[in-house]
């Protein structure tokens, strides 16, 4: 397969992961089709995606069937998995969080920090989503997410490299905003329990130094519990917190450059893209590290330098104050963080890894088409429609047009 360009179809790109990877693979050409922009997606999506025209699953499957012959392999994220299953593709599933720590195929699945289930699906729906999971030819997840993936059997692969788009996040940006007069932390992630906003608010009660936090006015709104808890956080802002409007992805580097430091996730115990982007923009980061979460690159275990190693509010407050009052403290932490991120976010190395994976998967699966029988594929769609309690008329209309 040497010398050939592999054509990869990505269905659903959560967090612009594969948009970044597409810039650094050499032996593969990645085409992404994403779900319609709405809500926060208007700001967080890259602006150069092909989009499905609507959220109707049958239309999305029809679209994929029209273009699939142009590709060698599919990669899916989130609900892209069900589209690939219904289109009978050979696909690799990549997970980034609640798509596997609270999977749809588990009854009343919920994340550990919530009491309310994320999904309340009936038996037939759960069975359908278990089939979409099992149908994948490989499952891939990074860092803390892999700890959840490995609970389920399958061709599970741990991949901790998280490449950063260096064309956007670097120290040469011309998007520098006016420098703030007061020491300023930037917090671009959503307000909510999963990001540790509740922990941060408690920590701020113990802080003694003078600073401000620019928090993006963006919060969790999924379940009733998510919505109510994030709303309480928004309505009870500590005095140090100032809300700023949502920011488009292309404009975020300017905010990194104008702040003094960045506050990342304080709950999950592992870094996300916010932490890595900030470091590549040469800003020190505060983020909780759980030492029990293992990180491996090139077969070697690495230790995350992000601090603190506890998410006790008083310990976080102490780190915040040290960041504010001591330039030497910040620089010492930043040097360790920067050296680590240079390895964990090396886009060239990540591009090589994905090129190698794509080649391996395509050698083992000669076509993007799974080549199931026509009746089997049709029954999958009917099963999906029935499990979602759709009307008989919709089922009959699909049968006539299929």
Could you tell me what each predicted segment is?
Residues 266-267:
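Aromatic "clamp/platform" in nucleotide-sugar-dependent glycosyltransferases that forms part
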Residues 86-118:
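Active-site proximal beta-strand in glycosyltransferases
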Residues 163-182, 254:
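Acidic anion/phosphate-binding donor-loop and adjacent secondary structure
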Residues 176-195, 201-208, 213-214:
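Conserved donor-binding/catalytic core segment of Leloir-type glycosyltransferases
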Residues 212-230, 245:
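Glycosyltransferase donor-sugar binding loop
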Residues 110-139, 146:
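Membrane-proximal helix-turn-helix segments that form the acceptor-binding/catalytic region
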Residues 284-293:
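Short hydrophobic beta-strand element within catalytic cores of glycosyltransferases
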Residues 325-367, 371-377:
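A charged, aromatic-enriched C-terminal amphipathic alpha-helix characteristic of glycosyltransferases
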């Amino acid at each position: 397969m040497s010398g050939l360009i592999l054509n990869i179809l990505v269905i659903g790109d959560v967090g612009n992961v594969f948009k970044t990877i597409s810039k650094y693979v050499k032996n593969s050409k990645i085409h992404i089709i994403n779900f319609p922009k709405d809500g926060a997606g208007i700001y967080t999506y890259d602006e150069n995606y092909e989009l499905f025209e609507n959220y109707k699953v049958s239309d999305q499957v029809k679209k994929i069937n029209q273009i699939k012959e142009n590709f060698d392999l599919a990669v899916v994220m989130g609900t892209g998995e069900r589209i690939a299953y219904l289109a009978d593709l050979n696909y690799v599933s990549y997970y980034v969080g609640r798509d596997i720590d609270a999977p749809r195929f588990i009854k009343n699945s919920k994340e550990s920090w919530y009491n309310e289930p994320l999904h309340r699906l009936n038996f037939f729906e759960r069975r359908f989503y278990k089939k979409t999971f099992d149908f994948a030819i490989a499952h891939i997840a990074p860092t803390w997410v892999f700890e959840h993936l490995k609970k389920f059997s399958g061709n599970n692969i741990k991949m901790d490299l998280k490449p950063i788009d260096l064309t956007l996040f670097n120290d040469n940006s011309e998007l520098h905003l006016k420098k703030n007069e007061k020491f300023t932390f930037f917090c671009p992630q959503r307000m909510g329990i999963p990001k540790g906003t509740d922990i941060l608010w408690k920590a701020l009660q113990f802080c003694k130094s003078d600073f401000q936090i620019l928090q993006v006015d963006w919060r969790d709104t999924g379940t009733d519990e998510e919505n109510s808890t994030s709303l309480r956080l928004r309505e009870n802002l500590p005095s140090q917190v100032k809300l700023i409007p949502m920011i488009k992805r292309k404009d975020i580097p300017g905010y990194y450059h104008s702040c003094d430091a960045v506050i990342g996730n304080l709950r999950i115990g592992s870094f996300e893209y916010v932490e890595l982007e900030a470091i590549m923009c040469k800003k020190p980061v505060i983020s909780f590290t759980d030492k029990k979460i293992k990180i491996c690159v090139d077969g070697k275990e690495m230790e995350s330098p992000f601090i603190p190693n506890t998410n006790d509010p008083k310990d976080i407050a102490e780190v915040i104050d040290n960041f504010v009052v001591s330039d030497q403290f910040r620089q010492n932490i930043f040097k360790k963080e920067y050296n680590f991120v240079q390895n964990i976010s090396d886009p060239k190395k990540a591009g090589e890894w994905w090129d190698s994976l794509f080649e391996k998967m395509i050698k083992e699966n000669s076509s993007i088409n799974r080549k199931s029988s026509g009746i089997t594929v049709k029954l999958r769609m009917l099963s999906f429609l029935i499990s979602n309690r759709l009307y008989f008329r919709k089922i009959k209309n699909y049968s006539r047009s299929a």
